[in-house]
Amino acid sequence: MTLASIRRGYHVIKTLLQYGLDDVLPPKMTPWYFKLARNSLFWIRNKHKGKSGGERLKLAMQELGPVYIKLGQMLSTRRDLLSDEWANELAMLQDKVPPFDGALARQAIEAELKAPIESFFDDFNETPLASASISQVHTATLKSNGKAVVLKVLRPNVEAKIQADLLLMSQTAKVIDYLLGEGNRLRPSEVIEDYRVTILGELNLKLEALNAIKLRNNFLDSDALYIPYVYEEFCYPRLMVMERIYGIPVSDIAALKAQGTNFKLLAERGVELFFTQVFRDNFFHADMHPGNIFISRDHPENPYYIGLDCGIMGTLSEVDKRYLAENFLAFFNRDYHRIAQLYIESGWVSEKTDLQAFEQAIKVVCEPMFNKPLDEISFGHVLLELFRTARHFDIVVQPQLVLLEKTLLYIEGLGRQLYPQLDLWQTAKPFLEQWMAEQVGPKAMFKKVSTKLPYWSDKLPEFPELIYDNLKLGRKLLSSQQQMLDKYLKYQQQAHKSNYLLITSAILLICGTLLFNQDATLWSPYVCLISGAALWIIGWRSRPKNRKF
């Protein structure tokens, strides 16, 4: 551990204690040695006693910087772990940091390009268009065609800083795991590992560029979503170049109203986009907070979304997709038994789970939701409450489903912000029912066969040879097994013969000894002893030598 990491660790502890976060820890996490350590830091006092626990955590993370801000944002989506009060406070964290020097950005860009910026771009603006904790965005125009572009570049030394904070978080999580013991609901190490994978993925701008290209290709003919063009030839792990867009931030409701945007159509398209990404393409944008979404300025009566920042993308297995769709349909049909079955069949909870107890727990949580109209029921909260319930039955956390839940909550919140009367169920139900219909029945079977047909037709000419080879191999195996059986039987015969001779020799030797002790003048003891010794020698020498067969 370096001096810098010790200094950083002390700063983190000091900040957490100054916000009195030790006061909100459960008794399990404050054994006598924790209290002793806390009392030894007597000069660090709680300066925010009047604030709630959630607000104090938010302020502490804001003070600790970008890595902790992003962790807080991620935790705000884990409502299966945190109370709504704490989650709502963390959701207010903003990833806003002062920009770094434009000259440093120029150096970083030129290091990736291995050439001066002016070799490829004109009008490079050293004043950033936007700045965040991991990267910064600058504007320019392409020298080759004069088109406006943005250059996204990582902050200097950001990787080392993030790795150092992640190591500290991981070590702290292990301590908390130890203090909470087996069976704790929070599972800090699991949370930090999910966060580590997410944030390290954001450090590779080449990967983000490839994600954006794939998402753009999925919606090339769409009138609902536009992904800016990515100039792949200028994309590297620390640099990404893409088309500049001029949309209206989705959070700027006043500007959207001023241009006469069709909010109902926009909200419905948002829901359709989510389900299309998940169920049609199996590739969904998992970071759809308002800062990454813009609305087109042209054709406000037929608006479309503009999506940015494809650093975090999610995918589901075919099994997960099917179980998820069935879950939603079962919920709105109030089939709680089927929901419980689906969680067990999918492997999300253990097959040893008490099905009746699990079904009853789901019913207790979900039934009150039907006291409100269908158009007021939140898909995201349905999924959230199901996960919370399953948590008590030791659910195996699926990171891809956590991403999905977060995205669904974003989309729902956004849709109802744009159009409060949005009936999410009526918008999504036809899509889910159509998708389920495509997964079962003759049509689905024909589609699956059609998908496999090229592979089968490629392998068909090899079938006769494969059948012949397998028959030949079968004969060899049969012959080999017969040989092994013969050897085994021969071994058993030899073993039985040897054992018989050894036992007989032992009996003769014992009898000879007893007779000799009674009357040494008789000839019978000598016959017994000599015969016994001879049989023992024959039996010993006739033992099978090789046990391999």
Swiss-Prot record:
Residues that span the membrane, as ranges: 498-518, 520-540
UniProt domain Protein kinase: residue ranges: 123-501
Predominant location category: membrane
Keyword Transmembrane among UniProt keywords: yes
Binding site for ATP: 129-137, 152
Keyword Transferase tagged: yes
Signal sequence residues: none
Subcellular location as annotated: Cell inner membrane
GO biological process, one term: ubiquinone biosynthetic process
Active-site residues per Swiss-Prot or TrEMBL entry: 287
Topology of this chain in the membrane: Multi-pass membrane protein
Domain of life where this protein originates: Bacteria
PANTHER family: CHAPERONE-ACTIVITY OF BC1 COMPLEX CABC1 -RELATED, PROTEIN ACTIVITY OF BC1 COMPLEX KINASE 7, CHLOROPLASTIC
The family this protein is said to belong to: Belongs to the ABC1 family. UbiB subfamily.
Protein name: Probable protein kinase UbiB
Species annotation: Shewanella sp. (strain MR-7)
Gene: ubiB
